[in-house]
């Protein structure tokens, strides 16, 4: 086994960075694998756009065309040179360090399950924020630039109040607390795991997103919702959709007769269920149809 097979890829790349073109050519010619590694890395670096780049070490070079950066280590990011094109920043579940050095280009920030640090120092460029299970600080510390807030895995009491700039509020799939009295009147879009009659959905909510919904007479959806997204429905009943709904989106597990959709629906989104379209006629009231 040669030394080139023993050394880590990052070590080899760092060695090459110190060589001029002549020495680099001689070095990589000693190992076909290293040649292809270097060639592949250069191709990646020259891509016009990289959607997601996972950063496994603070010393790694981040391609300038990266737009979504995922930090997979629990270390300060102060020494990381984050490219100006990065707008989405996601931290691993173990991350719980200072976020003082987040650049002002970030608009979407996702903090991991272990994070319980200061959030008042988040740059005002951030509009979308996700918090994890360990976050126990007051939500009022969140910068007023944030309009979309996701509370992930909360298993304890929420430390309010929710900032007045929040218009989109999401409670994660494993959120297990009552939301009664928690949704301010400035929130218009609400995402929750499951709806039941014990939940108090404020009448200022016009867009409701549900992971699952089981219809019965005692569990009817409120009649002031205009936009409705449902991922799972068990079972599907006739006229289970409020008459106020005009925009309707079904998830992957919807497989029902769409002719029962109320006449007020004009915009319909169906994900990976084409049998319901083949077997049934699309209602005449549908003016916009999106299939995934």
Curated annotation (Swiss-Prot):
What sections of the protein cross the membrane?
none
Q: Where are the FNIP repeats?
A: 95-134
Q: Between which residues do disulfide bridges form? A: none
Alphabetized Pfam families for the sequence: FNIP (PF05725)
Which InterPro entries does the UniProt entry name for this protein? FNIP, STK_FNIP-Repeat
Question: Cross-referenced PANTHER family, in alphabetical order?
Answer: FNIP REPEAT-CONTAINING PROTEIN, FNIP REPEAT-CONTAINING PROTEIN-RELATED
The identity of this protein, by name, is Putative FNIP repeat-containing protein L281
Q: What species is given as this protein's source? A: Acanthamoeba polyphaga mimivirus
